[in-house]
Amino acid sequence: MVLPVADLPDDVDALKAMILAMAKERAANEARLAAAAAEVARLKAVEKSANERIANLTSILKVLQRTQHGTRSERLRLAVNDEQVSFAFEEVETGLSEIQSELNRAAGDKPKRAPRPRKGFAAHLERIEEVIEPEVPADCAGLEKVLIGEDRSERLDVVPPKFRVIVTRRPKYAFRGRDGVVQALAPAHLIESGLPTERLLAYIAVSKYADGLPLYRQEAIYLRDGVEVSRSLMAQWMGHLGFELQMLADYILERVKEGERVFADETTLPTLAPGSGKTTKAWLWAYARDDRPYGGTSPPMVAYRFEDGRGADCVARHLAGFSGILQVDGYSAYTNLAKARAKTGSNETIQLAGCWAHLRRKFYDLHISGVSQAATDSIIAMTELWRLEDEVRGKDAASRAELRQEKSSAIVASLFELWEKELGKVSGKSKTAEAIRYALTRREALERFLTDGRIEIDSNIVERAIRPQTITRKNSLFAGSEGGGRTWATVATLLQTCKMNGVDPLDWLSQTLTRIAQGWPASEIEALMPWNFKPDAIG
């Protein structure tokens, strides 16, 4: 700022003071400019770092999005493990949120934008009202307050599971002038003279067999709350639980076999060999029934069976009494069972239906590696098959078969024509030839869905039932023993069936264990099934 000469003071000291003040102001301005320049440089550095990380995460996100979207040749959703994809999406979202928080912090105060509308929390959740009253201004002290409105917001909170002790007191009474004593009977419990309530047993079982939390981890978690329950004791409780629930699991398997179409699959379940301390390979077989895709009204369910082998004798024993469609992958045990039944002229006939998802995976690997144009063409055609399946899902069997005959059959015919031609062009030892032979040798089973609307294009229903058990297996390392494997199969049967029916497994199991302890009659076992569960009946 330049002052006119006339405005300058005549006094030397005053003039010096003015000059000194102007110098200080200039220095302060320069300091502010330097600080602003430093802040700009810092923000640019933060922005550059954020942009680099965003670009990296965005590239990952694009790859993941191709698992569900993209061109037909790029879609991967049937070849990628759903759990892996979900986990990757979660990690990307977490990374992006961290960057956004960093940018918000770097930007400091900024105008608040209008909040995005969001879906409210479920109505059944408990609401804890917290009213925050404003401070009364000094000049309004003593005046009457008039409520003219309020702002209301909700945040989701959690109360971690808390242990408590149920103290049961049963007073004894005597009557003057009369002999004897009266006292109420002790309530029945599944573990007599033991520590746990039925709800604690249910909580441990759901944590282990539904949520994949091994007993040794539960032991450590409970210790944080000062509760000492050893894993060996919990294992004993689970064994008793398996014994009590076996009848229910057997009943579900029988209900599964009443279906017109059953899905089957199997997965390994390592088990400790007696005496040696080494793990041996055992198997968890799964049999699922779900008629909803073709408009059926029967409840969905799954039954698991533990075996130390994987032979055809296992599946023959499990499916004794079943006659109908068996939808499976290409494993020979199922084929051998169907052939054996046909050879003996059994009334319990089995029609095998193939799984196009298993076949697709074989061609998908070749498509990704770029070694086979036929594989890429196959993937494109198969993607169209699944798109057509989306159109018929939930319709009745006749409508499904009609649309498949109209649109899908030509695609399937062209695929088998392509594979037959390609097989003569490639090396018999190549992966392409291996994939083609897999398809050609199972052609009848793979084509069966075209004429029967009850059949699905894949066996993903049972694969989804197997997946939670593979997660539990990974976390637990092994089943512990043959008895532990049987208990696993029994409890998992019931808890997974709960999930398939949209029932809270903890509420169902708590109620069911209480009823069993109280002597629920075996003749009314149907009322205990997850699909008949009524939450308001919990005691």
Swiss-Prot record:
Q: What is the top-level taxon of the source organism?
A: Bacteria
Against InterPro entries, the record matches this protein to: IS66_C, Transposase-related, Transposase_IS66_central, Transposase_TnpC_homeodom, Znf_dom_IS66
Keywords for this entry?
A: Plasmid
Family annotation (NCBIfam families): transpos_IS66 (NF033517)
Protein family (similarity comment): Belongs to the transposase 25 family.
**Any idea what this protein is called?**
Uncharacterized protein y4qI
